[in-house]
Amino acid sequence: MNNISFNLSGKSEKPVLDTLYTLKKVADSLNIPLFVVGASARDLILKHCYGIEPLRKTGDIDLGVEVAGWEQFRELAESLIATGQFFPTPEKQRFRHGTILIDILPFGPITDEDKKIRWPPEHEIIMSMVGFEEAYEYSITVRLSSDPVLDIKLSTLPGLAIRGQPRVLLRALGLRPAAPGG
């Protein structure tokens, strides 16, 4: 990748790097764009780019994957499991890689007109993916490792706010959201 916004080589823990390296390798082989979102993106940006220690650390990695439909998502899931390093969990979006939990969240053409996804086969679990496309479009590329090279996209702090997580950002910065009407 070109246009590295930050070089964070040597700043992430090896299990996280191993997980992201394999995830990205599999996604790239299937031409599936991905980016780190949620608290994991927040923590990487605040801690390693700006030197701000998060008040609460996240216990998982959240990834957005741009897929055309459920067949492409299933292909990604099966390919991850086929590596022998990823294991499914009872939650449809969640996988385990060693001790690390990964939530893989599909967005893009897979969503309906309201930007929602409905998880098969029952389609009873519904998630809003509002803001994911915009967050991906304005994501930054960071180098997490130089050897082997691991360049990955991260949602920016404004992207996290677009995604509806301003409270997460305020808490991370040690601030409190304003009270309604105040």
Where do the model's predicted regions map?
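Compositionally biased terminal segments of proteins
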Residues: 1-182
